[in-house]
Each structure stands twice: as C-alpha cells, then as structure tokens.
C-alpha cells in the first residue's frame, strides 16, 4: 500500500537575513511570518490539505541546497512522498537561481510535485507541469 502524499511548506531564513539572534527565541520572526502567510494562503485553496507538514531551515543560507531541511525535503520528493511544496517566495527555496530552476523545471515535474511560490504568483499546476 502506497503512503499518502504530503503537502509541505518549506520555511527558510539565513543568519545574513538579519532576524536570527542566537539564544533569544526558538525561531526567527521571519519564520513565523512565512508560516502565517502560507497558512492564510492554504485556507483559500480547496485543493490543498490543511494538514500540511512543515520543514524549516532557520539560520541557513539559500545559496546552496546543503541545508538539513532541504535535504530532507529532497529525499522525500525522490521517495514519492510529496504532492505539493509551498514557499512564501522563491528566495526562501533557493537564492541560486540556476540550481533552484533545475529543481523547478526538471526534478519536481519528474516526480509530479506541484510547486507554489505565493508572493511570486507561481504555481506549477497552472503551468501544466503537474
């Protein structure tokens, strides 16, 4: 029996983005802001599950994909466990636009993963990729 595919929201903030102060809070304010943005978006999308899994990389640069949460997400994609990935904007997914574009154009379509970037108004489903 195949496991049910998940809708995942991915949150990221690097230390360089300026909102991470060691020892002052469990997570940055920007992470909380990204979470609220995605939760509000999902409320108005009947084709998305309200029971989403969250993956967070707080304090990691987006210039490469070598982040614990991102590596977990990519393993899940390759295992066929992910239906949808939602980010607030593309820079939260990757600041390396060539590498990020490779996943958006090649990897995610191969695994039939829908990718949504809210602020960029990008939805791969509307592009006919999934």
Which role does the model predict for each range below?
Residues 1-130:
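Short, structured surface patches at the beginning of a domain
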């Amino acid at each position: 029996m195949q496991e049910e595919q998940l809708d995942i929201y991915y949150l990221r903030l690097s230390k360089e983005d300026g909102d991470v102060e060691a020892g002052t809070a469990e997570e940055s304010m920007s992470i909380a802001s990204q979470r609220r943005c995605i939760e509000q978006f999902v409320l108005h999308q009947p084709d998305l599950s309200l029971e989403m899994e969250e993956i967070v990389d707080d304090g990691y640069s987006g210039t490469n994909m070598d982040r614990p949460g991102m590596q977990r997400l990519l393993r899940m994609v390759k295992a066929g466990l992910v239906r949808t990935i939602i980010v607030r904007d593309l820079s939260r997914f990757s600041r390396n636009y060539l590498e990020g574009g490779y996943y958006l154009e090649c990897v995610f379509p191969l695994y039939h993963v829908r990718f949504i970037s809210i602020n960029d108004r990008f939805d791969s489903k509307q592009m006919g990729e999934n």
